[in-house]
Amino acid sequence: MKLPKAQLWLILLWALVWVQSTRSACPSCGGPTLAPQGERALVLELAKQQILEGLHLTSRPRITRPLPQAALTRALRRLQPKSMVPGNREKVISFATIIDKSTSTYRSMLTFQLSPLWSHHLYHARLWLHVPPSFPGTLYLRIFRCGTTRCRGFRTFLAEHQTTSSGWHALTLPSSGLRSEDSGVVKLQLEFRPLDLNSTAAGLPRLLLDTAGQQRPFLELKIRANEPGAGRARRRTPTCEPETPLCCRRDHYVDFQELGWRDWILQPEGYQLNYCSGQCPPHLAGSPGIAASFHSAVFSLLKANNPWPAGSSCCVPTARRPLSLLYLDHNGNVVKTDVPDMVVEACGCS
């Protein structure tokens, strides 16, 4: 298992503080001697590193152009299930970031910024477009994928749609047609024309589609995500009592508002950053644990570099579960993903 460097050094530092103060044979066997404020600051820093590592980010996204509230609310309604139950897929809402309005009333160019990592795992895509109430009659739409900036020359047909009503319309697109380049840029050209024979160019509204503000076009994507440990049985360990000396689960709730991250993490409002701590007497040594877990790997590293007695046992996680997140990425896309192994549910002696 490849260890996250930031988390490794952070927990390593914390563990060394415990060892120096308690002289324990295992850094998770005793409670921290840090003051409550110092411990809380360490927990918050660990939460930041854990979230960034789980999302494969080196730094938090900077939101320079907030989405319109109505558009954001609509995206959340589409992405947020009735309950935030973790699954094995990601959902993404990507708003058109650049709209090149052609001089023709019947053509528009939409540009989306997607992650190249999504390309090979994309299995469902829909383009949402808004037809204004002022449009009369029947509208015929065709969608093309462009290979160049202005769609000159090569282009690929993706879908067509016919409607007689205003409001939002969803066009299912072939996922193979949305494979992004290394840059992640996807350009779609829309061609639309009225089918009502009584409609003339002079009598048509200036724009046949809404392409700005609350009616901004967007892509709805579903992506398969590899989730290590999917289907792992959940075993819960009661929260440690204040004076419990034995191995147990200690709970810390981290509020994203406290981290200053509520501008880009939309849901949930926080999560449980639990960890395992306590003594492991000889009769508990070797109880079921996760040999390759992050905690046990850190403690194994500590053992290898310190003269601790052979056979000492450590308190490590024995069950974890993923954390479902709704967040804004660096490109302003709304992403729903399940970060694996984020929440410790049970502890045991390794």
UniProtKB/Swiss-Prot annotation:
One of its GO terms (cellular component) is extracellular region. It is found in: Secreted. Disulfide bonds join C240-C248, C247-C315, C276-C347, C280-C349. Gene3D superfamilies: Cystine-knot cytokines. The keyword Mitochondrion does not apply. One of its GO terms (molecular function) is growth factor activity. Residues 22-236 form a propeptide. Disruption phenotype: Inhbe knockout mice have a lean but lipodystrophic phenotype and have a severe fatty liver due to increased lipolysis in adipose tissue. Deletion of activin E does not affect the body weight, plasma glucose, glucose and insulin tolerance, liver functions, or food intake at room temperature. Cold exposure induces a rapid induction of beige adipocytes, and targeted disruption of the inhibin betaE gene blocked the emergence of Ucp1-positive beige adipocytes. Residues 1-21 form the signal peptide. Its main location: secreted. One of its GO terms (biological process) is negative regulation of adipose tissue development. Glycans are attached at N198. InterPro entries: Cystine-knot_cytokine, Inhibin_betaC, TGF-b_C, TGF-beta-rel, TGFb_CS. Keywords: Cleavage on pair of basic residues, Disulfide bond, Glycoprotein, Growth factor, Hormone, Secreted, Signal. Homodimeric or heterodimeric through association with alpha and beta subunits, linked by one or more disulfide bonds. Inhibins are heterodimers of one alpha and one beta subunit. Activins are homo- or heterodimers of beta subunits only. Belongs to the TGF-beta family. Inhibins and activins inhibit and activate, respectively, the secretion of follitropin by the pituitary gland. Inhibins/activins are involved in regulating a number of diverse functions such as hypothalamic and pituitary hormone secretion, gonadal hormone secretion, germ cell development and maturation, erythroid differentiation, insulin secretion, nerve cell survival, embryonic axial development or bone growth, depending on their subunit composition. Inhibins appear to oppose the functions of activins. Activin E is a homodimer of INHBE secreted by the liver that plays a crucial role in regulating metabolic homeostasis particularly in lipid metabolism and energy homeostasis. Plays a central role in the regulation of adipose tissue lipolysis by preventing the influx of fatty acids from adipose tissue into the liver. Mechanistically, signals via ACVR1C to activate SMAD2/3 signaling, suppressing PPARG target genes in adipose tissue, thereby reducing liver lipid content and improving glycemic control. Induces beige adipocyte formation and thermogenesis in response to cold exposure. This is Inhibin beta E chain. It comes from Mus musculus. The lineage of its organism: Eukaryota, Metazoa, Chordata, Craniata, Vertebrata. The gene is Inhbe.
